[in-house]
């Protein structure tokens, strides 16, 4: 390489902290299940945003927070929510060299929070454990079949984990007999410090909806400051367990006060604020993506019909067709 060209590149990477190579980072999208079979036209936008991973999310359904039966892989579900649909999505993504995390999730009727699933008796806890095992082991088998790089054993199930820790420890052992890849669990941002089985997994998974600013339009600097109370706790977890941190979900809505309660999906929040989404997202990247103990993350969320979703008047989480998509593309770029 020409000496002056080498010197110029060294200067650039010294001047720009985000110029560090992201070749080894998990630069992911949370690929939403739909009714449809997907093909190259649906995967191309994932490639164009420089993602190298997709979370494929089959679903199980439960009637209410006290109901022990999880219904899954039925012909009443959308195609992408089932095992055959998940496999088809994975095959389409693989053709474009996208790596895979399979992340089975539960939907509680009326959208109640899964972290509050709580049985009322030992008998119903046992029923739930049997049903959840059937659900999660089915997708562990799929993960093994398709050689998924990562398998997520659950998402935001705080009370289930709290009151049945031995079940979870035993479940991980069972999963390991079926699937030989990397394991994680998607703990909510206010749950991950209490999750008891990180020592049995490969990544400390966090759904990273940490509050970072109370301002209507938080500036980049506001959000950088807001992370200062959270980052030391997160990095200490990585150090204590000697495991990398993986943001199994991250992202912000394009609304006013997007950094105050980033987890809030209230449909009544309709005041679009694209700048707020850009600033919160950029601050997250600058805070974490350059850290060696940080594995990467999956932006929430990405729909298959790219040209028909998101946009400048959309107040939801998706970054698609919004200014923040370019921010993600920039930080996801590969320095090869």
Model region roles, listed by residue range:
Residues 262, 278-283, 287-336:
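Aromatic-rich peripheral "rim/lid" segments of glycoside hydrolase catalytic domains that contact
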Residues 1-23:
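Bacterial Sec-dependent N-terminal signal peptides
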Residues 28-33, 69-83, 121-133, 154-163, ...:
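The substrate-binding groove and active-site-proximal loops of carbohydrate-active enzymes
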């Amino acid at each position: 390489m020409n000496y002056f060209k080498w010197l110029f590149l060294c200067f650039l990477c010294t001047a720009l902290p985000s110029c560090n190579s992201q070749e080894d980072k998990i630069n992911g999208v949370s690929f939403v299940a739909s009714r449809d079979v997907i093909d190259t036209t649906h995967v191309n936008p994932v490639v164009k945003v420089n993602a190298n991973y997709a979370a494929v999310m089959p679903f199980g359904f439960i009637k209410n927070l006290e109901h022990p039966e999880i219904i899954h892989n039925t012909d009443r579900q959308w195609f992408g929510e089932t095992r055959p649909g998940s496999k088809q999505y994975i095959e389409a993504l693989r053709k474009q060299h996208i790596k895979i995390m399979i992340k089975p999730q539960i939907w509680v009727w009326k959208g109640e929070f899964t972290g509050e699933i709580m049985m009322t008796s030992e008998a119903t806890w046992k029923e739930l454990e049997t049903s959840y095992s059937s659900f999660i082991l089915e997708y562990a088998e799929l993960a093994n079949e398709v050689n998924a790089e990562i398998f997520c054993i659950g998402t935001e199930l705080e009370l289930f984990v709290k009151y049945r820790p031995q079940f979870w420890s035993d479940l991980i052992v069972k999963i390991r007999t079926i699937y030989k890849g990397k394991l994680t669990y998607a703990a909510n941002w206010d749950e991950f410090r209490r999750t008891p089985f990180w020592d049995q997994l490969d990544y400390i998974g966090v759904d990273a909806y940490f509050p970072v600013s109370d301002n209507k339009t938080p500036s980049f600097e506001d959000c950088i400051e807001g992370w200062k109370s959270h980052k030391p706790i997160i990095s200490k977890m990585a150090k204590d367990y000697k495991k990398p941190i993986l943001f199994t979900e991250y992202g912000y809505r394009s609304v006013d006060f997007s950094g105050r309660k980033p987890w809030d999906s209230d449909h009544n929040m309709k005041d679009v604020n694209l700048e707020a989404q850009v600033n919160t997202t950029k601050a997250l990247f600058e805070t974490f993506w350059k850290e060696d103990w940080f594995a990467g993350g999956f932006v929430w969320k990405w729909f298959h019909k790219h040209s028909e979703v998101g946009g400048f008047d959309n107040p939801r989480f998706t970054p698609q067709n919004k200014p923040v998509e370019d921010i993600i593309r920039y930080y996801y770029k590969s320095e090869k």
